[in-house]
Amino acid sequence: MQEIDYHVIKRSLSGADDECGDTGLVREHDNQCFMALIDALGHGKEAFDVAVLAERYLAAHYKDDLTALLKGLHGNLQGTRGAVAAACRLNCNTGILKYSGVGNISIKLFGSKTKRLITRE
């Protein structure tokens, strides 16, 4: 598989550096790279708990179709404070990127031309 650089950095508003409602997940499989971002509503321990729940769901279902994945994540987060999410899958052979998101979240592609992908209704 072609080498891909990626980084996930989390910074807490207060408390432990990694105890926040922001998280990301990257998984490589079958010449594809799955990437997801989660931003749980609010701050602190409660937001962190939602982010952990979301990350666990994504880790178990990252090979699913993106639409089905986000619908499943929505169901998995029922009863929590909720989160916004973005997920994409890059086919490393073709360079085709598929993207889906829910809520006020976006991803940015960097290269010869920078492009921002936002979620639309």
Name what the model sees in each region.
Residues 1-53, 106-110, 116, 121:
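N-terminal entry segment of metal-dependent catalytic domains or homologous docking segments
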Residues 20, 48-115:
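Catalytic core of PPM/PP2C metal-dependent serine/threonine phosphatase domains
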